[in-house]
Amino acid sequence: MSRVTAAAGTVLIFAWTSVARAQDGPGSAAELLRNAAVKGALAAVKTNEPQTIEDQIRFCEIPAPPFKEAARGEALKRTFQELGLQNVRVDKAGNVLGYRPGLAPRPHLVLAAHLDTVFPEGTDVRVRRAGAVLRGPGIGDDCRGLAVLVAIVRAMNDAGVSTPGSMTFVADVGEEGLGDLRGMKQLFNETLKGQVDKFVSIDGTGLGISHNFVGSLRYRVTFKGPGGHSFGAFGLANPIDALGRAVAKISDFQVPAQPKTTFNVGRIGGGTSVNAIPFEAWMEVDMRSEDRAALASVDASFHKAVDSAVAEENARWGKPGMLTVTKDLVGDRPAGSLPADAPIVRTAFEVTRALGWTASSGAGSTDANYPASLGIPSLNVGGGGRGTEAHALGEAFDTTDSWMGTQRALLLAIALAER
């Protein structure tokens, strides 16, 4: 049974004697909803939603291109401090952390949203309003997640909520593109190594729950040769021709529809002049799957295709070894999944149902990939509202009933912070 008592002006929540009961006991999420402190925090979320939206806009209008998240991170640091989080700090990677102690250090829940966007430096990040719709690069992905982090802390403060376990709120770096989850790797390999029991990332919009983790491998492939004049040195093996052969082979890959497995040559470059045989050409390749074996299979096909392309281009001109190739791994996100009956997954769906809503289950590539690969119960949830055109300059966020995502994230956090 839950019971609520007051101490030093703070409402203390004592609910469930074990995590198992929180996840298995009939009506356990409903029991939390009967708790006066929890009800107060949920009400505060709805009341505070205009402020949450203003925070979302404020964060979004601070540029945070890949590897340059510091300015936005500083804004989160100040906000964490203003909300009274403890030990607010920036770690070696640039993650911003703020600690909210519970009655005991464990269980320790980490809630995270990422600072970075996919948009390059110089992008106009001003947010435009049209009724309930906000438009701006990154407004949903992941400025909504950052605003929800702040809203959870604010609502718990407003209602005087304390939980048995502790929480750390993290605004992290390096989730997008070639960031390669560097923020998560720093967080779990050093900053909070061995200290985290559960992890929830808030990334994207709506009420989806992702507990299947799309892994990816990303390479920058560089073909090199002697180069020379297009007429005078004709007959030299051409790095761009080798690149073209490789792209043609990759485009013919056959991959399974289930588990969904994909490949993409996203960027290419090279050469110095129309009348010069290039000395270098490069491409960037992305491969994804939620299944580790399927990802390994397409990865093996990729290596074979590139090596064969170089051999064929050298053979074409009868000059073996003239061209060389390097394949630099620039991104490695582990694939995996949690079963639907995993405690953290059941809790997320139970909390959603207790609030009277439904949630879809899907796969995603988010910050949750990395802690999940370490065996830490992890998942990703949407931050509410409705997002469209993610990763596009016209990215939009419909604020209609967006408070629902914050309420769900708040109730999930409280449930997971129970003993």
Region spans (language model):
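Metal-dependent amide/peptide-bond hydrolase catalytic core
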Residues: 23-40, 56, 239-419
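A non-catalytic alpha/beta surface segment that caps or lines the substrate-entry region
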Residues: 53-106
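C-terminal segment of classical bacterial N-terminal signal peptides
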Residues: 13-21
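Acidic-glycine-rich active-site phosphate/pyrophosphate-binding loop
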Residues: 115-130, 196, 211-222, 350
